[in-house]
């Protein structure tokens, strides 16, 4: 292998190429690689922030859901208590009204019983007077008296 001037010229051209590449080609490539690395790092940091924010938001949502469930349960319990109170009040009113109706019916039945007794007394008195008149008009006879008493029984 012979070393001649072309080898030195090729070495110089190679050095010029390396210097040119280091001066003009390598900085934009290095800059692009650095920018890409920075974007990747920023993306990872943003993903971490988003993940932590997501965890915080999920916790807040769970807290709000638990609060809402508790409020809903308490409102439902209040509504059930109110409904039960209204039902009890309606039952009490209905019982009271029923008692009034029963008392009125008993009073009316008692009044009708008294009126019926009065009517019966008047009829019995009239029949007794009528029977006494008939007995006094006729002669005193045990058979006739028994017959009259039997007729009076059937009329009563």
Curated annotation (Swiss-Prot):
A GO term for molecular function: proton-transporting ATPase activity, rotational mechanism
Transmembrane portions of the chain: 7-27
Broad class of the protein's primary localization: membrane
UniProt keyword list: ATP synthesis, Cell inner membrane, Cell membrane, CF(0), Hydrogen ion transport, Ion transport, Membrane, Transmembrane, Transmembrane helix, Transport
Record's GO cellular component terms: plasma membrane; proton-transporting ATP synthase complex
Membrane topology: Single-pass membrane protein
Subcellular location: Cell inner membrane
Biological role stated in the UniProt entry: F(1)F(0) ATP synthase produces ATP from ADP in the presence of a proton or sodium gradient. F-type ATPases consist of two structural domains, F(1) containing the extramembraneous catalytic core and F(0) containing the membrane proton channel, linked together by a central stalk and a peripheral stalk. During catalysis, ATP synthesis in the catalytic domain of F(1) is coupled via a rotary mechanism of the central stalk subunits to proton translocation.
UniProt record similarity statement: Belongs to the ATPase B chain family.
PANTHER family noted in UniProt: ATP SYNTHASE SUBUNIT B (PTHR33445:SF1), ATP SYNTHASE SUBUNIT B', CHLOROPLASTIC (PTHR33445)
Subunit and partners: F-type ATPases have 2 components, F(1) - the catalytic core - and F(0) - the membrane proton channel. F(1) has five subunits: alpha(3), beta(3), gamma(1), delta(1), epsilon(1). F(0) has three main subunits: a(1), b(2) and c(10-14). The alpha and beta chains form an alternating ring which encloses part of the gamma chain. F(1) is attached to F(0) by a central stalk formed by the gamma and epsilon chains, while a peripheral stalk is formed by the delta and b chains.
NCBIfam families registered for this protein in UniProt: ATP_synt_b (TIGR01144), PRK05759.1-2 (NF004411)
Protein's recorded name: ATP synthase subunit b
Species whose genome carries this gene: Paracidovorax citrulli (strain AAC00-1) (Acidovorax citrulli)
Species classification: Bacteria, Pseudomonadati, Pseudomonadota, Betaproteobacteria, Burkholderiales
């Amino acid at each position: 292998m012979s070393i001649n001037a072309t080898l030195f010229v090729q070495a110089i051209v190679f050095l010029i190429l390396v210097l040119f590449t280091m001066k003009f080609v390598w900085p934009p490539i290095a800059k692009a690689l650095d920018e890409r690395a920075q974007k990747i790092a920023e993306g990872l940091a943003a993903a971490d922030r988003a993940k932590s924010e997501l965890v915080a938001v999920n916790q807040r949502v769970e807290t709000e859901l638990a609060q809402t469930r508790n409020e809903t349960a308490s409102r439902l319990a209040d509504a059930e208590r109110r409904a039960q109170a209204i039902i009890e009040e309606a039952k009490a009113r209905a019982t009271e009204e029923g008692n009034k109706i029963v008392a009125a019916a008993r009073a009316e039945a008692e009044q009708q019983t008294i009126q019926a007794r009065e009517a019966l007394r008047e009829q019995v008195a009239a029949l007794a007077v009528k029977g006494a008149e008939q007995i006094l008009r006729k002669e005193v006879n045990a058979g006739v008296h028994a017959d009259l008493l039997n007729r009076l029984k059937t009329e009563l």
